[in-house]
Every structure is written in C-alpha cells, then in structure tokens.
C-alpha cells in the first residue's frame, strides 16, 4: 500500500491510497465505511444529444467521481473491490455509480473521523510494502542470484559466482558461505526464504544453511526451477510458492493466538470471549490482547454499535488489538466464539 496524500486536521480529513496488492484491497474493505466520501478515476457513459439518437454508440469516458459510500463488496478472485453509492462530486450528481478499485487504483478517502485501527492498518500495510517478506535465492553449481519480492515485481539484489580453482570442495564451501553472508546482511528478520534452482545444488546449500544459520534457515523452503536469474525468479512466482508463504505467515500468527486463547479457555484461565466478558475484563484493565474478527468489526460499525469504544479502551490501557481474517480458519473459529475475545494480563472473575 502506498499513501500518496495525507491531509488531516485532527482525525478529520483525506488520505489518498494506491492499492499495490490483493491484501491492500482487503485492507481497504475494512478502512472504508458506509458514509465515507471516496474519489477515484472511473468510467461512465457520457450522454449527449447525438448519443440519444444512436444509443448503441454511447461510449464510456474516464472521469473522476466522488461517491458517498453505501455498499462495498470484495471480489477476491476478480482482484477487485466494488464501492457503490450516489455521486456527490463530478458528472451526474445524484445518480448512483460503482467504483471498481483494483491493484494500481488510486483512491482518496474522506472521513469525518478516522479511527485508530484504520490509521494503524494503513501504517502497517504501508510498512509491509517497503520491506521484502520473501527473498528468493536461485542457485545452481557455481552461480547464485538473490532477489527480493516486492509488490511491483522482483528486485535483483546480487549475483554470486564461485571462484575457479583446483580445491573444488573448499571453493564450494566458500561459495555457499558468501551466499549466507549476503543473506545475513540483506534479509529482514520476519522474511521467508525460497531456495530455488535446477538439480541438487539447492538441497546441498540448504543443508549448509541449516548448519551455519539454523534460525534463518528454519524459514527456508526449496522450489524446483529450470534455471536461475530473473527467469528462475519468475518460475518461483508462477508456481505459487510466494503466495503460499504470504498466506501461511498470517495464518501462523493468528493460529498461534487462537491456540493461546483456546488453551486459556479450557483451563478457565486468563481469557475472555464474547462482548459481555471482554467489556467486563476491560473494566479491570485486564485486556492484554484483543482478538476481533474482521466481519464482526465491519458489522458492528454498520449497526452503529459501540465497538470502536471497546477498541479505544483497549489501546488506552496499553493493550494490543489484532484483527483476524475470517477468510482463514483461525478467524472462522473466532467468529464462532462471538467474533471477539481477549487474552488477559490476569484472570477476572464475576
């Protein structure tokens, strides 16, 4: 996600955003609310006198419209967020229109009051876009390429070539050591690593990696490709390894929190679930981590419930708020528990 403009007075005002990934479109679904004013470039039929005489000739023109949000629908498999409502700025004011927000679309969102979790979601998505979540090492005998997976494609970080000489085994170890040294300097702590390439060199390197950097190597997996270099990087992307890693990373975080919650519930320990119990725990300042399903958050806001007051109270008490995706199993489990739960600093009774 890229923020292209931020114009706020206190909590009121406009933030312009360009969606760079499918995740960004999903984030926008929970940032934009009913009643917001959203601007974007879109296509709309331009009626004229000649068009009315020949209706089959009516063409759509590109215009910038501002619509008051009434409905939203996220089409995951079409990579599109549809925002529907009456036009307030631009041509055909008062008529209804649907904005199709896709990867690469820039939109401006104007709110009377931006909420903490919405601003935090933007910040987290923006920071995620700046650091590589996945690093690819494409390696074959004597040659290796390291690339960062960015939202806009693959950034080639370095090319490493094994020196030539008679001491082949020693040179191979030196070659592997150079790759590991570069990974130590280049790879963020939370990044996963895909080791790709033809033949068995990648397995030999992974073994060396585990021996020299076991913690970093624990986040590595291998993928077969027919070559290295940019073509090898593209093969990794086509095979879906990067998409699986990104999804599994989120699922792993949410699964871990859900396991902690269910364990505490089973022991009648430091946990609360359902709005009534969570609000009760909040009164005592006991909430350490609030878990809330994205659909519960969206539905609560649409119904005008005091859900944002709960989030604010958690943050004021130095607690953490984690929004779960109901697209994955941990989020589904949370939704079945009432959509909201909390891991507590201490047990609360009564």
Swiss-Prot record:
Gene3D superfamilies reported for this sequence: 3.30.1330.30, eRF1 domain 2, Pelota, domain A
Cofactor: a divalent metal cation
Domain of life according to the entry: Archaea
Transmembrane segments: none
UniProt enzyme class: hydrolase
This protein's UniProt keywords: Cytoplasm, Endonuclease, Hydrolase, Metal-binding, Nuclease
SUPFAM superfamilies registered for this protein in UniProt: Dom34/Pelota N-terminal domain-like (SSF159065), L30e-like (SSF55315), Translational machinery components (SSF53137)
GO BP terms: nonfunctional rRNA decay; nuclear-transcribed mRNA catabolic process, no-go decay; nuclear-transcribed mRNA catabolic process, non-stop decay; ribosome disassembly; RNA surveillance
Entry EC no(s): 3.1.-.-
One GO molecular-function entry: endonuclease activity
Major location (coarse): cytoplasm
UniProt-listed InterPro entries: eFR1_2_sf, eRF1_1_Pelota, eRF1_2, eRF1_3, Pelota/DOM34_N, Pelota_arc, Ribosomal_eL30-like_sf, Transl-rel_pelota
UniProt keyword Metal-binding present: yes
Compartment(s) of residence: Cytoplasm
GO cellular component terms attached to this protein's record: cytoplasm
Biological function: May function in recognizing stalled ribosomes, interact with stem-loop structures in stalled mRNA molecules, and effect endonucleolytic cleavage of the mRNA. May play a role in the release non-functional ribosomes and degradation of damaged mRNAs. Has endoribonuclease activity.
Comment field on protein domains: The N-terminal domain has the RNA-binding Sm fold. It harbors the endoribonuclease activity.
Similarity field: Belongs to the eukaryotic release factor 1 family. Pelota subfamily.
Binding partners and assembly: Monomer.
Name of the protein in question: Protein pelota homolog
Origin species: Methanosarcina acetivorans (strain ATCC 35395 / DSM 2834 / JCM 12185 / C2A)
Lineage: Archaea, Methanobacteriati, Methanobacteriota, Stenosarchaea group, Methanomicrobia
């Amino acid at each position: 996600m890229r923020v292209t403009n931020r114009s706020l007075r206190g909590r009121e005002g406009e933030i312009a955003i360009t969606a760079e990934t499918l995740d960004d479109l999903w984030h926008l679904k929970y940032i934009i609310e009913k009643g917001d004013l959203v601007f974007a470039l879109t296509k709309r039929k331009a009626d004229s006198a000649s068009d009315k005489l020949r209706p089959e000739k009516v063409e759509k023109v590109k215009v910038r419209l501002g619509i008051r949000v009434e409905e939203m629908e996220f089409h995951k498999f079409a990579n599109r967020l549809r925002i529907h409502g009456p036009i307030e700025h631009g041509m055909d004011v008062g008529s209804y229109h649907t904005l199709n927000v896709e990867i690469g679309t820039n939109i401006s969102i104007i709110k009377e009051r931006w909420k903490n979790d919405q601003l935090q979601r933007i910040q987290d998505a923006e920071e995620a876009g700046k650091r590589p979540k996945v690093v690819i090492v494409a390696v074959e005998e004597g040659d290796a390429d390291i690339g960062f997976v960015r939202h806009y494609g693959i950034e080639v970080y370095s090319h490493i070539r094994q020196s030539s000489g008679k001491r082949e085994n020693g040179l191979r170890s030196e070659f592997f050591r150079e790759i590991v040294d570069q990974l130590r300097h280049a790879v963020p702590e939370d990044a996963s690593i895909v080791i790709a390439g033809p033949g068995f060199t990648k397995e030999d390197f992974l073994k060396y990696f585990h021996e020299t950097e076991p913690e970093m190597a624990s986040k590595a997996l291998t993928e077969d490709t027919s070559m290295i270099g940019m073509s090898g990087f593209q093969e990794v992307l086509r095979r879906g390894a990067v998409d699986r890693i990104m999804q599994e990373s989120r699922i792993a975080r949410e699964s871990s929190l859900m396991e902690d919650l269910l364990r505490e519930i089973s022991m009648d320990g430091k946990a609360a679930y359902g709005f009534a119990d969570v609000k009760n725990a909040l009164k005592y300042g006991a909430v350490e981590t609030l878990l809330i399903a994205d659909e519960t958050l969206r539905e609560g806001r649409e119904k005008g419930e005091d859900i944002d007051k709960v989030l604010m109270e958690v943050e004021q008490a130095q607690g953490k708020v984690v929004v779960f995706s109901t697209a994955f199993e941990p989020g589904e489990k949370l939704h079945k528990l009432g959509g909201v739960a909390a891991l507590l600093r201490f047990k609360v009774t009564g």
